[in-house]
Amino acid sequence: MVIDFHTHSFPDELADRAVGRLAQSGGIHNYLDGRVTSIQKSMKKAGIDYSILLPIATKPSQHTTINDIAVTTNDTFRESGLISFGTIHPDNEDYRDILRNLSKKGVPGIKLHPVFQRTNIDDPRYLNIISCAFDNDLI
């Protein structure tokens, strides 16, 4: 079994802009265009069984939309090997409810990104989020 454990996708209408911003802000060269269909084609070509999508909330207000997309992605594409994690921002004070909801909806884990979320991995907010994620059986 081959698993690509670090992929990103965006809704088709946002993909070009999001990929462009990542390239510009992080100096990241993308090999695909950020669309689920491109990841699926790449998986097939490379013999990848599963790809894990790791969305990132760069603002506290983004978690609802991003996590709704993650749940929809899992419901729609899990059978074809795409599994999306959820996300949370360290400034989300209601992190317990967010994590509990992700777990209830079958999302397997969360993506944290200290650089894009402008904090450090040992930030006490992250430590609280990680502990709560563990308590909710999230990776």
Which residue ranges define each predicted feature?
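An N-terminally biased module of ancient metal coordination in phosphate/nucleic-acid-related enzymes
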Residues: 1-55, 60-61, 124
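Active-site gating/metal-coordination segments in enzymes
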Residues: 49-50, 60-139
